[in-house]
Structure formats: structure tokens, C-alpha cells
């Protein structure tokens, strides 16, 4: 019984869809009913009709429900009021500022398994406006951040104290690895200590900073 009711519901939905399609084909396009084949459309009318506004647009259901790939929808697209059109500046784009949801009955089919009429919600636009494009806005924000950063860096550089640089002569040209040099005083000291040399039964030569055999 339920199966029969589903098919009746399906048949009625298909009939209504076909009738509406025939009516839409027969009805003249908005503003085109009295137009002559070679008539030139005036600038003001072209401008008004092409400017940013809400207009009925056929939207693919999979565009709105990308995760429901296991289903087939009938119809596969739905008429929705969406923002479209041109703005007076290339840096602006037509975007929705007021939106609302509309519920539609859609035939939802799972091949070889089930089919039913489902209530599906879609977003419609009720008001549009020309706003700065995202990429332009991001570039402006980056520029302002860069400008602030540069100013701060300059201030830091100006306020930073640079101590005078000292250049010390090397303690030894050949045996640099044996010496440790203080960069501020340029004083040289031996890397190895006397106790280390004595542990090897040697003596520290403070001039060469090497562990040598004791003199007798």
C-alpha cells in the first residue's frame, strides 16, 4: 500500500513538473514580450538589468549537497533567487547581504534500493550589495600590516644601541685552537689548564699554551 502511494505521489510530482516546464517555455521572457527581432535595447535598461541584484538562477542540487553523492535527485537542479550582476568598480563584487532558507520537495532516489519525496532546504538571497572583493581586501590588509611592521622596525633600529666593534689580533697564527680570547679585552689565555697537563705528567707552557715535558 505504501509503495502504491509513493508511486502516486511520484506521478503527481512528475506531472506538475512537466506542466510547469511547458508553461515556462510558452511564457515570454521578462521584458522581451514586445521586443522586435532587430530592436536595440537602450543603455539605461541594459545597465539596470545587468547591475547587482537578485535573480532566479538554476542551481545544481549537488552544488548545495556535495556529500550526498549516493543519491540521484529529480529534478537535478532547483530555481533559487541568487545574487548576480555587475558592479561599477572592478574591485567590487555582487554579494548577498540578506538570506533566508526555502524548503522544496525533491525526489530522492537511491539506485536499486529506495526512492521517496524528501523535504530539502536551500538558501535564497533576498538582498544584494556591491562589496570589496576578498582578494583585494586581503591585499589591502597585508599592505597595512607591512607598513606598520616597517615603521616599528625602523623605530627599533633607531632606538637600538650599537656597541663599538673591537678587532682583536689573534693570539697565535698557527695554534689558534690552543688559546681562548676575551672579545672585550683581547686578553689571551690558555685553553688547557695546568692541572690537566699535570694529570698527563706534563707541564703547561703559558707562552705556547701547550703541555710539555718538564725540564730537568
From Swiss-Prot:
Pfam families recorded: PDGF (PF00341), VEGF_C (PF14554)
Disulphide-bonded residues: 52-94, 83-128, 87-130
Expression by tissue: Widely expressed. Abundantly and equally expressed in heart and liver. In kidney glomeruli, brain and yolk sac, isoform VEGF-166 is 5- to 10-times more abundant than isoform VEGF-190.
Compositionally biased tracts (Basic residues): 142-161
Compositionally biased region (Basic and acidic residues): 132-141
Gene3D superfamilies: Cystine-knot cytokines, Vascular endothelial growth factor, heparin-binding domain
Subunit structure as annotated in this protein's UniProt entry: Homodimer; disulfide-linked. Also found as heterodimer with PGF.
Primary role: Growth factor active in angiogenesis, vasculogenesis and endothelial cell growth. Induces endothelial cell proliferation, promotes cell migration, inhibits apoptosis and induces permeabilization of blood vessels. Binds to the FLT1/VEGFR1 and KDR/VEGFR2 receptors, heparan sulfate and heparin.
Name assigned to this protein: Vascular endothelial growth factor A
Gene: VEGFA
Amino acid at each position: 500500500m505504501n509503495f502504491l502511494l509513493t508511486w502516486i505521489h511520484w506521478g503527481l510530482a512528475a506531472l506538475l513538473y512537466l506542466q510547469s516546464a511547458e508553461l515556462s517555455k510558452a511564457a515570454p521572457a521578462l521584458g522581451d514580450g514586445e521586443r522586435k527581432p532587430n530592436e536595440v535595447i537602450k543603455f539605461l535598461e541594459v545597465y539596470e538589468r545587468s547591475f547587482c541584484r537578485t535573480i532566479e538562477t538554476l542551481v545544481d542540487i549537488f552544488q548545495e549537497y556535495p556529500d550526498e553523492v549516493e543519491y540521484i535527485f529529480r529534478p537535478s537542479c532547483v530555481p533559487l533567487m541568487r545574487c548576480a550582476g555587475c558592479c561599477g568598480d572592478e574591485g567590487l563584487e555582487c554579494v548577498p547581504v540578506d538570506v533566508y532558507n526555502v524548503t522544496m520537495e525533491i525526489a530522492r532516489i537511491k539506485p536499486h534500493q529506495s526512492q521517496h519525496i524528501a523535504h530539502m532546504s536551500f538558501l535564497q538571497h533576498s538582498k544584494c550589495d556591491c562589496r570589496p572583493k576578498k582578494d583585494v581586501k586581503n591585499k589591502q590588509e597585508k599592505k597595512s600590516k607591512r607598513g606598520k611592521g616597517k615603521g616599528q622596525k625602523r623605530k627599533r633600529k633607531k632606538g637600538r644601541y650599537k656597541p663599538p666593534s673591537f678587532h682583536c689580533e689573534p693570539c697565535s697564527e698557527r695554534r689558534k685552537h690552543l688559546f681562548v680570547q676575551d672579545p672585550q679585552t683581547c686578553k689571551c689565555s690558555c685553553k688547557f689548564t695546568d692541572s690537566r697537563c699535570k694529570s698527563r705528567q706534563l707541564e703547561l707552557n703559558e707562552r705556547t699554551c701547550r703541555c710539555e715535558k718538564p725540564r730537568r
